[in-house]
Amino acid sequence: MAVYKLFPDKDTYIFTEVSIANAGYDEMIEIGGYPVVGIGQAARILLHFKDTEIANVVDNKIGNTNFSASINLKLASAYETPTSHSVHAYPIYEYWDGGVGKYGDEPYDKSGCTWRYAGAQNSNSWTLPHNTVTMPVNITGSYNSTHLGGGNWYTGSNGYDLHTSQSFELNDNIDLNIDVTNGVLLHYTGSITNNGFILKLDDAYEFNTTSSIRHKYYSSDTNTIYPPTLDIKWD
């Protein structure tokens, strides 16, 4: 089986802890659910891979659409991993700015998307059920009255199920290798706009107040040999 690896042109993570701060240039990207002063928080990963690079692989390397695709992330550190959990992936509905911020920047960096906003400089609130009279078909997000925002995503399109997940048990290797074949296929065909993918924990573990589940992965800005990749495979 042949494998071609693509690297993100932008990646970040959005987090409720500072819902208007960007982390688009951080060396780590994080998913999690954890408390801060008793208030549940969440973190989600966003990645984008260029249309032109996907098309080049499909058109010039494979020559057809008989391929699989997965997002590969290498774990840097994990805290309070539960006995079992899943990570979920969806194609993102809305355009977002990557930014050049880092977690912990003072003052907060606003050069890219955040938990609350899709655009730079805290512009363009994410389109979500709480601020939109009628959400587009097959588009959703999550609602938390304490933390408005968190991105939006496709659940399906053109008969394709666009939700995928990877499940883990205690003591498993929790590097991510999560299938996104249908999403990449619809990006390639233009059936949905390519705004990348969002990765998140199970709903039950986000906004956690009883444990601190935090999984940090190397980002495209890492100085290691473990940046994220989109692995496209074919026979």
Where are these regions (language model features)?
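Secreted, disulfide-rich extracellular signaling modules
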Residues: 1-235
